[in-house]
Amino acid sequence: MLIATPYEDLLRLVLDCGVAKMDRTGTGTRSLFGQQLRYDLSVGFPLVTTKKVHFKSVVYELLWFLRGDSNVAWLHEHGVNIWDEWASSTGDLGPIYGVQWRSWPTSSGDYIDQISTALDLLRTEPDSRRIIVSAWNVGEIPQMALPPCHAFFQFYVAQGRLSCQLYQRSADMFLGVPFNIASYALLTHMMAAQSGLLVGEFVWTGGDCHIYDNHVEQVQLQLSREPRAYPELFLAQRDSIFDYVYEDVVVTNYDPHPAIKAPVAI
């Protein structure tokens, strides 16, 4: 069976053709601008197989975002520490993703729950071109521990199927992107289930797509491996998208190559 490998293909392109650039962390990168990946979610769940992705962390982080939370305490309760490097001494991260998704502040002093608004539109106006969620709140970026990398996403309905396109301004191709692809693919499944729709495509669009100089050996190892078939996702039925728990999300037939460790650029 022919296995589609859009992520690995882009990883190889950045490795071979990326332009040398410095970055905020001082690490150095190989970078390409304006790239896109497409996944048909109806034929498999896009969890990278050329290295093991820690799917537990993917699920708990998404549930944490959907809670509107921005303190790592809840993640710690579930054994997830992926945000620790950026958290304050009290565990706070400022008004990052979940806060913007669930309680975007307005000039009148109110708050907008963008996830609920998007769901309402999917149910009542599925042809709307305004089914958008943004984490890029310019006025609150100075208070965020880290400005949003995956900043903006849009939903699209056609022929009873829900698709999602994400714009990721800054894309750490080795460590971050496999995680982000899985997270937004899962979110698309959840939003579809809550809207009475089937899943369509997940489209990932990257701005600065980069490989850090200290990830090159790891990338070369990953690209030497033979990709395997994508797993399947099973999602329990819940009355609300905010009711999902970790046990509701099950991935089967995930047979990845071993994990590859690499340093995080902070």
Curated annotation (Swiss-Prot):
DUMP binds at residues 24, 129-130, 169-172, 180, 210-212. SUPFAM superfamilies: Thymidylate synthase/dCMP hydroxymethylase (SSF55831). GO terms for cellular component: cytosol. The active site is at 149 (nucleophile). It catalyses: dUMP + (6R)-5,10-methylene-5,6,7,8-tetrahydrofolate = 7,8-dihydrofolate + dTMP. Pfam families: Thymidylat_synt. (6R)-5,10-methylene-5,6,7,8-tetrahydrofolate binds at residues 54, 172, 265. Pathway: Pyrimidine metabolism; dTTP biosynthesis. GO terms for molecular function: thymidylate synthase activity. The keyword Transcription does not apply. Belongs to the thymidylate synthase family. Bacterial-type ThyA subfamily. PANTHER family: THYMIDYLATE SYNTHASE, THYMIDYLATE SYNTHASE 1. Catalyzes the reductive methylation of 2'-deoxyuridine-5'-monophosphate (dUMP) to 2'-deoxythymidine-5'-monophosphate (dTMP) while utilizing 5,10-methylenetetrahydrofolate (mTHF) as the methyl donor and reductant in the reaction, yielding dihydrofolate (DHF) as a by-product. This enzymatic reaction provides an intracellular de novo source of dTMP, an essential precursor for DNA biosynthesis. This is Thymidylate synthase. It comes from Mycobacterium leprae (strain TN).
